[in-house]
């Protein structure tokens, strides 16, 4: 990593956009710098970061990427994003390229109906178990209703990078934590874990309509072929999904 630091003194250039109008709309992204966003220099735990958005046909375009060890909602405020956007943070061995070396922007897409993004594998692996695929973040899909809330109330809530709860409070935070390792299959552990979380969720004093919709989305998460890392969802104005810093395979900011 130390040998590559000289090459990472400045983030990569803004990726080519599809039209001059889009290029003007996203021109501010080219001026982003990781130091201005996170206040930290390069370190061994850095990750590749990419801003992704899609058109009405579900085709995804990566607008910007750089190498950084921490990302917050300041990234979106600095880029002045006004459309649904997904921010992905990849492990070092994932990189932003496909098997044949082409850029990921040509091989990924976003379905805005389900807010799902599919990522291609970067390399073949001898061991094709679920655990290996999960570590690569091959597929991570999540869909949730954007809760209504005022801009003033949203500005008062600051994402926490270290604190994770196991309950939901009205207009605050949903947190799903990683279950303990066991000898049970991953999908079975995740199913049991999700059912336990839903029981806790139903006991909270929240709007019944939003509760029903959120439960449906959590059930979709339960159908994933692997167990997601810990993440937090901020349910007003900005939805913030924060994966634990222990092993962030994929982080989605909606």
From Swiss-Prot:
Keyword annotations: Early protein
Gene source species: Human cytomegalovirus (strain Eisenhardt)
Top-rank taxon, per record: Viruses
Protein name, UniProt field: 30 kDa major early protein
